[in-house]
A protein has these predicted regions:
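Noncatalytic, beta-rich nucleic-acid-contacting surfaces in large DNA/RNA-processing enzymes
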Residues: 1-361
């Protein structure tokens, strides 16, 4: 019992955020206690992550994505095989061939869009604008997935688009009247409930972290703000709705939304990367597939999937050749992919480098 009482209330273990980096203008030790952590090259904070922001530190999430390496490898392949220097940041966001690829569901190898379920929804949605891809990226996750069929029907005019209040239309028009992003709720809270920027950001945090007690506190402010907003009151009357009931209806929908709330900035970034890979696959298929294969050399299941995709696309993959193959998969001037020797089981990079060295003598 004595030992149990001693241990009671103590922390069992500490965890480390996979990609959270704290930034400060002064030494971090002036603000928080830090400690070394096994297996980590950087020091970590002894404070729980929830308490870092309130004391004035910025936490940035720096994600390392394999897809970025695939894009870089693909651009290198294009330069070598076609002598074209392509800048991924200059890829147009209205390319017809790219959207055709998405509408066919030919998205194997495309970041965030290659699951069978996503392919099925893309074929039904027939996306023809970048905003559709952003919305699908946010909707295709547990919770909001149930809204995808309605989203698709509304896009094609098969289901009426309705707004609880006229003031909500500017913020929900792009998503066919369905609340998809946290930012939409933030903007509406300011327009309808007269929230300040700070209060709307607090609402975002409450939704993102699913802090239902804080949401309950904010509800009172929202109800009061809507009642004191003459534009909201007038709009409710035009709709023939009771102000109190309408406010509670809107807030109730937001509370349900809080269980799957997603931020648009995140979706835009991911959809942008997916669109870039879609453009590369549509216009430079051999170079793109070679890049995918090269970045998954040691994962035989991935290599098999991408080889099958090459076959489906009608791309020619040439067998390994000591006179032509390199460590990675490459593309020749005829648009054929040459198998990378490093993908051969039992052949290491050192052996490949030796072969290349010998043939170049």
């Amino acid at each position: 019992i004595q030992f149990a009482e001693t241990l009671e209330g103590s922390i069992r273990q500490t965890g480390v955020h996979a990609c959270g980096i704290l930034i400060s203008r002064d030494p971090l030790t002036d603000h928080i206690p830090i400690m070394p952590t096994e297996g980590e090259s950087l020091m970590t904070t002894q404070y729980d992550g929830h308490f870092v922001e309130p004391i004035g530190l910025i936490k940035m999430d720096f994600l390392g994505l394999r897809t970025l390496s695939i894009i870089k490898t693909c651009l290198d392949n294009i330069k070598k095989s076609k002598h074209i220097v392509l800048n991924e940041n200059e890829i147009p966001l209205d390319d017809e061939e790219t959207f055709k690829l998405f509408t066919r569901g030919d998205t194997t190898g495309l970041f965030q869009f290659e699951s069978p379920g996503m392919k099925k929804h893309l074929r039904a949605l027939q996306p023809n604008r970048f905003e559709d891809l952003v919305a699908m990226n946010a909707l295709y996750r547990p919770g909001p997935m149930e809204y995808i069929p309605s989203f698709i029907r509304r896009k094609h005019g098969e289901e009426p688009i309705e707004y609880d209040h006229p003031m909500m239309e500017p913020y929900l028009k792009d998503t066919y009247g369905i609340t998809v992003y946290q930012e939409q709720v933030m903007l509406q809270s300011r327009a309808l409930g007269l929230f300040t920027r700070g209060q709307s950001d607090t609402l975002r945090k409450a939704m993102g972290k699913k802090k239902f007690e804080l949401l309950a506190e904010l509800k009172g402010k929202f109800v009061e703000g809507c009642k004191n907003n003459p534009d909201f009151v007038q709009g409710a009357k035009e709709k023939g709705k009771d102000v109190e009931e309408l406010v509670n209806k809107i807030w109730g929908d937001w509370e349900a939304f809080a269980s799957y709330a997603f931020n648009k900035s995140h979706s835009v970034c991911y959809a942008y990367i997916a669109y870039q890979t879609g453009f590369l696959k549509a216009h430079y298929p051999a170079e793109f597939m070679a890049a995918n294969l090269s970045n998954n050399l040691s994962v035989i299941t991935k290599v098999t999937v991408f080889m099958d995709e090459c076959k489906r696309m009608g791309l020619s993959v040439l067998a390994p050749d000591v006179n032509e193959s390199y460590n990675d998969f490459t593309v020749n001037s005829h648009g054929q992919i040459r198998f990378g020797m490093a993908a051969i089981k039992g052949v290491g990079e050192a052996a490949v480098e030796k072969i290349i060295e010998e043939r170049e003598k």
